[in-house]
Amino acid sequence: MVKNLSIWVISQKENKENRGSVEFQIFNFTKKIRRLTSHLKLHKKDFLSQKGLRKILGKRQRLLAYLSKKSKIRYKDLIDKLELRDTKTHQ
């Protein structure tokens, strides 16, 4: 429940800001990933959803790589807010 609450707070703040920003796009992908992950826990043989999840994961990974190259501070803040792991390639 804590993750959902923190995501809701971030989304309310981001709704007033730029929706086209990299941070907002990563936030939306993270929200979709968490929703699909919970769906796949119930429906293990839903292979189309698995494929969609892999696509979204790749898009989020590319955006995170872009953000880490552009601004390390914004990248660190975002992964802390969304409770994501920092990969070794982005350090």
From Swiss-Prot:
It comes from the Eukaryota. Its main location: plastid. It holds the Pfam family Ribosomal_S15. GO terms for molecular function: structural constituent of ribosome. One of its GO terms (cellular component) is ribonucleoprotein complex. It is found in: Plastid. This is Small ribosomal subunit protein uS15c. It comes from Cuscuta exaltata (Tall dodder). The lineage of its organism: Eukaryota, Viridiplantae, Streptophyta, Embryophyta, Tracheophyta.
